[in-house]
Regions:
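Extracellular/lumenal/periplasmic "stalk" regions immediately C-terminal to a signal peptide or transmembrane helix
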Residues: 1-22
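Short secondary-structure junction motifs
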Residues: 16-18, 65, 110
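Short Gly/Ser/Thr- and Asp/Glu-enriched loop/turn motifs at secondary-structure junctions
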Residues: 23-27
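Short, aliphatic-rich beta-strand segments
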Residues: 28-33
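Periplasmic OmpA-like peptidoglycan-binding domain that tethers envelope proteins to the cell wall
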Residues: 37-55, 59, 63, 73-158
Length: 158
């Protein structure tokens, strides 16, 4: 899949532990560790995040027909930062921040993007260990399949 190769090429020089690209059932997932994007307990984006998102945006801008969702994910440790109600709130605010950066800094069309918060409810690993919690704190860009092409495949030929 050309899109996956382009993404891997664009962000290939970044630490593999902090970014993971995978394809599952026709959907492309780009997982970015929270430590690359945000300070702990915050939804303010880091300078490093802008560099990473710029590389992803370059690939997405080259594919104007693709829609995608930005999901914020947290661990299960309760949040105590002022102005943040809980982990679900933090995950939504982080996803919204990423979407805004992609739109305002890199010109991605907001009609192509959805921001969603998953809180601690879709963990990759067990939250009982520090490693598991670190893996669960991430932002995921989900590149959605093009449904019009999918439906064309389902149409019966007459």
């Amino acid at each position: 899949m050309a899109l996956v190769m382009n993404l891997k090429g664009a962000i290939g020089n970044l630490d593999d532990k902090d970014i993971n690209i995978k394809v599952d059932k026709g959907v492309v997932y780009v997982d970015i560790s929270d430590k690359l994007l945000f300070k702990s307990g915050s939804y303010a984006i880091t300078d490093r995040a802008k560099e990473v998102l710029g590389k992803v945006a370059k690939v997405l801008n080259a594919q104007p027909d693709i829609e995608f969702m930005v999901e914020g994910h947290t661990d299960s440790i309760p949040i105590t930062s002022p102005g943040i109600q809980d982990n679900w709130d933090l995950s939504v605010k982080r996803a919204t921040t990423v979407v805004r950066v992609l739109q305002e800094n890199y010109g991605l069309d907001p009609k192509r993007m959805t921001a969603a918060g998953r809180g601690q409810y879709l963990p990759l690993l067990d939250n009982a260990t520090p490693e598991g919690r670190a893996a669960n704190r991430r932002t995921r860009i989900v590149i959605l399949p093009q449904l019009d092409q999918f439906f064309k495949l389902l149409e019966t030929k007459k």
